[in-house]
């Protein structure tokens, strides 16, 4: 099983998860051309895709969805609320409704040899979800765009072998930054985005011996830095009430606009 961030940041997100036989993208919030280039770097093309899992309808998650769907007739998996919003978005171009596949929170579905299990998240979108994807007993979690987490979130993300988790902003950078007040409040709110520190606190509750890799994703260009995100999360893990140190795990920050190193989950 492989996990690879093709791009992850507040300006565009596209994550690859696959096995030898099945190839999925989680979101296409970048251009179709860039998504294809990312697939090419993995030895794949758009024709190899078995599905696109959409977390929610914001443009940094769906900008290239229409292009990829039309060119390759790839099935699109999303919640009812998200699919309804996508169909209203004129800037994506027409997408054949026959490609739409409805998913429901906490209801598993099978795409060839992968099992997909959507999970609820708290974000200001119609019906947003994160995804847990399993190949046999190996599991990957993709969880970004959540303003808060709770016991449900923790239970959903326990037992992952690899996890891509949001570390969107440094609170101090956001507070003194150029964003207008209403936008700062949105980001800091319960339906906004997870800060570096809260990302680390969430991780402290789900770490386990068999966790192979942690990828910090969806960093804000204006309100975060890769080194800040990494260090804040590292400190939360090391100083938190858990038996681990950050150095016990492979941890990286996903690149905003370039393909990140591939994580092979064995």
Sequence positions of predicted segments:
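Active-site metal-binding motif and surrounding structural segment of the metallo-beta-lactamase
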Residues: 33-79
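Metal-dependent catalytic neighborhoods of phosphoester/phosphodiester hydrolases
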Residues: 63-72, 87-90, 224-231
């Amino acid at each position: 099983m492989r996990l690879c961030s093709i791009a992850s940041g507040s300006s565009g997100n596209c994550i690859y998860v696959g096995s030898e036989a099945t190839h999925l993208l989680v979101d296409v919030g970048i251009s179709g051309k860039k998504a294809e280039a990312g697939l090419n770097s993995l030895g794949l093309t758009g024709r190899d895709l078995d599905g696109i899992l959409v977390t929610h309808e914001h443009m940094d998650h769906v900008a290239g969805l229409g292009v990829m769907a039309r060119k390759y007739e790839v099935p699109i998996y999303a919640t009812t609320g998200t699919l309804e919003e996508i169909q209203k978005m004129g800037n994506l171009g027409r997408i054949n409704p026959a490609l739409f596949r409805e998913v429901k929170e906490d209801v598993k579905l099978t795409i060839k040899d992968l099992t997909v299990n959507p999970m609820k998240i708290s974000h200001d979108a119609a019906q947003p979800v994160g995804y847990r994807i399993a190949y046999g007993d190996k599991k990957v979690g993709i969880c970004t765009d959540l303003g808060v987490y709770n016991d449900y979130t923790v239970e959903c993300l326990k037992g992952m072998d690899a996890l891509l988790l949001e570390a969107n902003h440094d609170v101090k950078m956001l507070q003194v930054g150029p964003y207008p007040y209403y936008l700062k409040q949105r980001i800091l709110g319960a339906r906004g985005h997870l800060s570096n520190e809260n990302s680390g606190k969430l991780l402290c509750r789900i770490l386990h011996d068999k966790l192979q890799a942690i990828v910090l994703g969806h960093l804000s260009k204006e309100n975060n830095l890769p080194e800040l995100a990494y260090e804040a999360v590292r400190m939360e893990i090391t100083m938190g009430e858990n038996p681990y140190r950050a150095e016990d795990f492979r941890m990286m920050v996903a690149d905003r606009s370039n393909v990140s190193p591939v994580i092979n989950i064995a």
